[in-house]
């Protein structure tokens, strides 16, 4: 797509302004000037940025960001909370039943949460039944405790994913970040110990659908990779690139802000935290049309200026500005010294701020120093005004500033993994700390005899009962002793008959009633 190629060309390989975007190109290396004829003038090819000597091309396949990729990656998931419901039932003397419900929490397991979510998603009645309170049981003068464990599923719970380290961002996570989910750790801990977060789809829920596969050509020199030609035919140099992972995929961030899945570039180092990648959304397509028109216009202006030079056999400083190379790389620089057209080999670099090349009044930095002008003329149409100020024609381009603002707004505004190393992956994943809890059956526990009294009344009743029992014991013991005494004092009936004696009227002891009777009868007869 030509608009894409132009858009990427305009931002290719800028200077050492880390995290910045180019606004102008200036020679950082400028060869000796040599006179030329006007027939040697040519318009630069700004569609190609080539490295010298990289002429060996071979086909290969790579991945790059999709067109229309949106910066925020949403991941649908759900939260799972472990709930324990207790039903405490007490039955008093008269059979009155009192039931009290209590709720506690427990730490759920990922497998049980996945089962509960599947039940809820499928409309399985087992999920609703698992949330019901336990059916209370009762026993006379006893407290019956019935417990039931349930898993409460709340969905959807949408979180953001950081494309740089595939971590998850949400306020429900500790410190607002979760290192991510995997087979070993299929969940994220939350701010509550009894709640975990899991993705809805275990297979595609965490995949980054932001890449597209493209075909291009490797550019090598003596077997060393130095660049490649992308699918749109645009050459991209690997100079200044750095290693960067997107969604767990290793690749290179090129200095134009684009990202490709090239991994075998030995010289590349890991990107610093502020090196983000550019995105290409649909809104930028509208601006790209303006950029394409501007580039075509620049090309036409350069050709018109060149035609005018050839026709009139005359040249001006303004016309020379059209011959400047608009992208970093090797090119030509032109100037007029003592009314003679001069040419020099140059290597262009990008700048971000005008102050980089105009640090003070009358100073134009080129080649690492304030460049010496010749009668107020520098090169590429840059001149010195009568009041001593450096004048650059492109400084008046409003569209250029609009293009820079577009690039800045296209940076992925998410946290880079190197920005805060303490929040990235930790040594231990908390998966093993969780117990695999499947929804258990209702548990019932029956206590001993309980009168349903408060604590102090219970002890008071126990004391009264003990005293009563003690008094009753004493009473029984006393009664038993009295009975025993009576039994000991009462004589034997046989012995009583034998020992009975009666004293007669005469004063004589009679051993028995019969003897007394016989004696009494004898006295009466006498």
From Swiss-Prot:
This is Glycoprotein. Arg-352 is highly involved in rabies virus pathogenicity. Its mutation dramatically attenuates the virus. Glycans are attached at residue 338. Residues 1-19 form the signal peptide. Its main location: virion. It is a single-pass type I membrane protein. GO terms for cellular component: membrane; viral envelope; virion membrane. Attaches the virus to host cellular receptor, inducing endocytosis of the virion. In the endosome, the acidic pH induces conformational changes in the glycoprotein trimer, which trigger fusion between virus and cell membrane. There is convincing in vitro evidence that the muscular form of the nicotinic acetylcholine receptor (nAChR), the neuronal cell adhesion molecule (NCAM), and the p75 neurotrophin receptor (p75NTR) bind glycoprotein and thereby facilitate rabies virus entry into cells. Primary surface antigen capable of inducing and reacting with virus-neutralizing antibodies. Almost all human and veterinary vaccines are based on the functional aspects of the G protein. The chain crosses the membrane at residues 460-480. Keywords: Glycoprotein, Lipoprotein, Membrane, Palmitate, Signal, Transmembrane, Transmembrane helix, Viral envelope protein, Virion. The keyword Membrane applies. Belongs to the lyssavirus glycoprotein family. The lineage of its organism: Viruses, Riboviria, Orthornavirae, Negarnaviricota, Haploviricotina.
